[in-house]
Amino acid sequence: MSSLRNAIPRPAHKERSQPEARKRFGILEKHKDYIIRANAYHKKQETLKILRQKAAFKNPDEFNFKMINSKTVDGRHRPKDEVNKYSAEELMIMKTQDIGYVFQKWQSEKNKIDKLTASLQCTGDQSSRRHVYYAEDREEARELEVQGRSKSDISTVEIPKDIKKKMDRSYRDLEGRKSRAKDLEKLYTDMSMQKELQKKGRKRKLRDDELLNPNGKAVYKWRADRKR
């Protein structure tokens, strides 16, 4: 009997939809969605209740590391000055490691640029390339002219769209890598200069009137030390 009862067609029970006047509010929330939202809300409320209790029963004289690592300024805790946290030798080692990483990334970008340029060098504008041939007589000149026309016809073959899209994507990637390589080169130069300025020895910054070709960049001169 159960199989016969299941064989009787029944109307499909559809989910309630949002009323026409409230359609701008999106899909109507179902009971299971309300359960998830309510559980999340009550969980957050319980967490806030526990935190409020901890704050209420906290001993203000309880030891905290900020008591020795910070000081009070205008009623607020400020971390102590960390200027002398590292020695000069430790700072030099840290900067050297950073410079090495920047140099490695710069060289990696340069290698990728070379590979992309090598793969795209034969897909550029062929019309700008011109070759000059010298013929001995008119007959040879006609042959050279016919060969040039046939080569130009081959070069003007329409490239498929998918290949053209890949080429455009590769050119955009190449331009982006060139920009990143330029930024990394500038960063490496600046970091190398800062590293040299941290070394011992008297130095001074040259003025623009002391330079042959001033370009706005800082130029330093070190005092020559007598070698023993």
UniProtKB/Swiss-Prot annotation:
* Entry-linked InterPro entries: SSU_processome_Utp11
Tell me yes or no: is tRNA-binding among this UniProt entry's keywords. no
Disordered: region residues: 1-23, 192-211
Q: Which UniProt keywords apply?
A: Nucleus, rRNA processing
GO CC aspect terms: nucleolus; small-subunit processome
rRNA processing in keyword set: yes
- Alphabetical GO biological process terms: megagametogenesis; rRNA processing
SS bond list? none
Basic and acidic residues biased stretches? 12-23
User: Where is it located?
Assistant: Nucleus, Nucleolus
| Quaternary state and interactors | Component of the ribosomal small subunit (SSU) processome.
- What role does it play? Involved in nucleolar processing of pre-18S ribosomal RNA.
Per the record, the similarity remark reads: Belongs to the UTP11 family.
Q: What is this protein called?
A: Probable U3 small nucleolar RNA-associated protein 11
